[in-house]
Amino acid sequence: MSNIAAFDWAGVVNYAKRRVGEVPKTQYELPGVNVENHCDVPVACVPLWHSVVTARLSIQKGDKAALKQAKERLDKALAAIEAIYPLYPDGILIQVAYGLPYFREFVPKVVADKFMPRAIENGKPGDWAITDAIKYPKDPAHLVLEQNDISFHFKSDYADHISEVMRALFQPGPQMLNGIPTEDVYVGDLFTITSIRRGFAGHGMPRVMAQRLGIPGADKIPPGAMLFMGFTSSHVHGLAQGTLPSFETIPGYTDQTPESYFANGTMMHLSHIAIDLEGWYNINHAGRLQRMFHARRTETEEVLSPSQAPDTTTFKEQLEDDAKTHKLLGHNAQMQFLSRVDKDTTTVYGDVIPKGTVIFLRQDFDTVENPFEFNADGPVSPAPKPGVHFIGFAPSAQLFDKIRKEMDGVDLQKKYNLPDENTGFTKFLVTTHRQHYLEPSRAHRSFPLAEMI
């Protein structure tokens, strides 16, 4: 272990006192994210730079002492990092999630069965609310369904913060955190890294990055757009607020309560999706607008952030009418009858949310990787490719799978004989990798259930 004593950064500056704000119980809520007004539409200014690291555990399966020691080390490492960098976009935000292999292979079955959240099926607790990822109707044959034990999502307005933290966590030897030498946060011996995925999420970034890399179709990306496909990604009304994606918050999705071990946890989906940029921009603005949202949209080309307020929600009857009348389905409209509440709803915490409120949270980010920066299990191409590392949070994997199947739109497409190009925008996407994870609360982010074995 380190010969360098842990630096008492709090003795220099106590970020907890410098920044007034309560640390969230969830990992997915992001302190310090401000909101801009885009033509009266609120848009969250999410962290600019992102990296995801996936890994398998290197400790021996069944070694309870080793797992408990790993939990203690990771807890201390994350706490040390957050003492050096503020828990804000201008510092660093870290989320840790766990794949099913972790719970199946490292946690005794009797313990996992006792504590794991279960989806409500026919009014009763059924299967675990985290499942293996599956293929959907329009997926390519080469799609990889991953089986990682753990994933780390790092985000910051400063790319150097992410790089420094990743080196300190995963590379042995002396490292620097905010100018301070350190070895006490190294936990790399606990993992075998399977992939490193990097990207960005900022207004105008897709066009700038695509132009600099010479990606075909770059000049057609609207200036100021957050997405390669145009438009804005982080509409406040299009992102679940507070703890709405947690297992326990909305009654009826899982058996979890505010007192459950996995309260303030959620199901996390991670995938990589490549984008056919030239094909997408062969469609005019009105066509792209309607395929992104719904066939009744009329906003002009200058509007990158059409309203996503609850009263704009498309429910199932309207979706079918779009298919019947307009012969076109919008991507957002395809899923909203599942990703939003269909009536005024009271959460387990007593909050009343209006009909049309979204309960699904996205934290996806753009990428030009093909498919990753590093991939232990497959090839990586140096040729840049526009895409997205998609991260989403839902109360259960079962709900996510229902939402994602609707994105393919197979039933309405067959019923109304719609061409692929009029069924959302799935035709222009190719998913290469996919996995579901459980993201626990901050209190249990380091090897959940290890203390129970």
Question: Model-predicted segments: where are they?
Answer:
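Long, histidine/aromatic-enriched segments associated with O2/redox biology
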Residues: 3-453
